[in-house]
A protein has these predicted regions:
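Gram-negative bacterial Sec-dependent N-terminal signal peptides
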Residues: 1-18
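N-terminal pro-sequences and low-complexity stem/linker regions of secreted or lumenal proteins
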Residues: 21-333
């Protein structure tokens, strides 16, 4: 899951149209008021859009003009020169892609997805570019040389959009700090990245109070899995087990007396990973506090109502519904 994470407040979208309004909101005194004045943190994670895919052409960021990107030992060129050949894979099926570059073309550079014009500006925002699973992403990573994105995860994986295609995201990026050195927690799919988001790790941390080996505690979480049980390596070793049993960030917040809640609709695209933890499953059976705060469905409207009425907890997590997740084929917001 290549993701975009935005840390902001509920009023950002409304204020983004006016730079002066934004400046008054987050810095009302004209100086840095300090962390002690931050009363609410809102965490919002979206799906499957890379930084360069959105902001590679943005001025002032480490995008496509970055002179310090890695030079592959295999090509002796920087990673913006991606090799192509007749051996390209379909990232979803791991089968030959079925179409090939023109004769004598052996590399592909980042390109504007809607280069054909017309309705392609809308159509390409819905396009799927390979997959984000562990195997395909690490094949593209190629032991750190990062020179097999087009080969192992389709040529679409290095395409980008322009500001005109995603004006809301650009308004946010221009008004606030943009994380051009922000990376996903793990080069893999949704579940492990969201597990890391809610717990700080994809594997039981050292010193966990849960008895047993890693397979009993659930880790390491390397790919998506919804049902109880484990995936297995070729040698039979377990990974991506469900349920998980180590401690989550919300539990630490609660112990520290910090209020928190997950805001989501029943359509949450399966993106609330707290349901994977045993303690939340147990809490749900007992109608306990962990489940009420973390795995229930208060609805996104509840977030807007609480923001309006000054009732937000100190830490809010937002999980978007499927069609607003930005996960291809669903469009950017």
């Amino acid at each position: 899951m290549v993701q975009v994470t935005t840390l902001a407040a509920a009023v950002v979208l409304g204020a983004a149209a006016s730079t002066s309004a934004v400046e008054r909101w987050y810095n009302p005194h004209g100086v840095n008021p300090g962390l002690k004045n931050i009363q609410h943190v809102v965490l919002f994670m979206q799906e499957n859009r890379a930084f360069d895919h959105y902001f590679g052409t943005m001025a002032g960021v480490r995008g496509f003009q970055d002179p310090n990107v890695h030079v592959s030992k295999n090509t002796n060129k920087d990673v913006f020169h991606q090799p192509v050949s007749r051996n390209m894979w379909n990232g979803d099926t791991l089968q030959p892609l079925g179409y090939f570059p023109p004769k004598d073309v052996n590399e592909l550079k980042p390109y504007y997805l809607a280069w054909q014009g017309g309705d392609w500006a809308n159509r390409t925002q819905c396009m799927v570019a390979g997959t984000n699973d562990w195997r395909q992403n690490h094949a593209a990573y190629n032991r750190g040389e990062m020179d097999k994105w087009a080969m192992a995860n389709t040529p679409y994986s290095i395409g980008y959009v322009h500001e005109a295609d995603i004006p809301v995201q650009y308004k946010l990026a221009e008004a606030f700090t943009v994380g051009d050195m922000y990376y996903e927690s793990i080069m893999s799919s949704t579940a492990p990245n969201r597990v890391s988001w809610f717990s700080g790790t994809i594997n039981p941390p050292k010193g966990s109070k849960v008895n047993g080996t890693n397979k009993h505690m659930g880790g390491p979480t390397l790919d998506n899995r919804d049902s109880v049980g484990c995936e297995r390596t070729d040698s039979g070793k377990p990974f991506s087990c469900v349920p998980l049993r180590w401690k989550t960030v919300p539990e630490y917040l609660q112990e520290a007396g910090i209020s928190w809640r997950v805001y989501q609709d029943k359509d949450n695209f399966g993106d609330d990973p707290l349901v994977m933890w045993k303690q939340y499953q147990t809490s749900a059976k007992k109608k306990g506090d962990l489940a009420q705060r973390g795995t229930s469905f208060p609805g996104l409207q509840k977030f807007f109502d609480d923001a309006r009425d000054g009732k937000l907890p100190e830490v809010s997590y937002i999980v978007a519904p499927m069609q607003l997740s930005e996960h291809p084929p669903y469009m950017p917001m």
